[in-house]
A protein has these predicted regions:
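Multi-pass, polyprenyl lipid-linked donor-dependent membrane glycosyltransferases
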Residues: 113-117, 142-173, 192-204
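Juxtamembrane segments of multi-pass membrane glycosylation machinery
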Residues: 92-113, 272-283
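Transmembrane-helix motifs of polytopic, lipid-linked glycan transferases
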Residues: 108-133, 173
Length: 313
């Protein structure tokens, strides 16, 4: 007769054998890609289904109008925004995405490609956990599950179309490749990051600070300088030239000064106010919302939050 104790032992042994198989190099390579594929399918189906009931935000409409204008050979000036779509965030990654819409239906293409960007982030996240943080399969699985079920991830998938989503896997992959000293590959991923949104140059600069803290001073300084330079050139030269002559988000920085260069001078002359804005209550609550589901995991180190801090001001 099988007792409860015997059944429990059999269950434990079966679980241990399963975990041992997952710890094998082959399973470690395949598992994150399988998870990413499943997550992509789920997110894509949810986003497309949401679009059918007209439940998506206006951001999708902005980019669909821009696509139509670009196909017609006209400047993509979105009527509701009153400016060129690229003047908003200098999201030049939208150009190659637009090429796909010439082959596939525009709405579904934008949503499916966005879902892919969200899902594929699982792979570098897994690799960071396994290689950089030396976590076991169980801990990495918990991180992956926390990411997949995170409210911010689900809301982003169902909130229209946002080119900056493509920066998420690229930023994680850039950090991972930096740990392996593959700097040309890092450069490719960072190009994806900054072409997704101009102010993500600040996130690249913060990633450079992370590299500096990890004894990669020379490369870290270079990455930080490139990220900061990209943001400044895009925000104060390219975006005003494409748009209405000034940085389109100046109202958010009105407390620092008037005009693009007035804001820049105000931020440089009073860095403590900038730091205060980054760590004010609302920004701090954003950080807690982002990391709360994974605070118990050993992967989390406070310096890894630095790439997102510039975006909270």
């Amino acid at each position: 007769v099988t007792t409860v104790h015997t059944a429990r032992r059999r269950y434990d042994m079966a679980l241990l054998r399963f975990q041992a198989r997952l710890e094998s190099p082959k399973a470690d390579r395949i598992f994150p890609w399988a998870v990413a594929l499943c997550l992509w399918l789920v997110l894509a189906v949810l986003a497309v289904a949401r679009s059918k009931d007209l439940g998506l935000s206006s951001t999708l409409g902005f980019h669909l109008q821009a696509l139509h204008l670009m196909e017609s050979g006209v400047s993509p000036d979105v009527s509701e925004l009153g400016t060129n779509i690229f003047a908003q965030h200098a999201a030049f990654i939208f150009f190659p995405i637009a090429l796909l819409t010439k082959i596939f239906p525009p709405t579904e293409t934008l949503l499916v490609v966005q879902a892919f960007a969200i899902a594929i982030a699982v792979v570098p996240l897994w690799r960071i956990g396994r290689e950089s943080a030396n976590l076991r399969i169980g801990a990495c699985s918990a991180i992956t599950l926390a990411y997949a079920l995170h409210p911010s991830v689900q809301n982003l998938n169902l909130a229209g179309f946002h080119p900056e989503v493509f920066a998420l896997p690229a930023l994680l992959a850039a950090y991972l490749q930096g740990q392996k000293e593959r700097w040309w590959t890092v450069a490719v991923f960072l190009l994806i990051v900054v072409s997704s949104r101009s102010d993500l140059g600040l996130a690249v600069a913060a990633l450079g600070v992370v590299f500096i803290l990890e004894d990669k001073q020379r490369k870290g300084v270079l990455v930080a300088a490139i990220g900061l330079s990209w943001f400044l050139v895009m925000a104060f030269v390219v975006q005003p030239a494409i748009g209405n002559g000034e940085y389109p988000h100046l109202k958010s920085f009105a407390s620092y000064g008037a005009g693009s260069f007035g804001v820049l001078f105000g931020m440089i002359s009073d860095p403590f106010s900038v730091l205060g804005d980054l760590f004010e209550r609302e920004s701090f609550e954003k950080v807690l919302l982002l990391v709360a589901p994974v605070l118990f995991l050993p992967l989390v180190r406070m310096r890894y939050l630095s790439p997102v801090l510039p975006l909270l001001g």
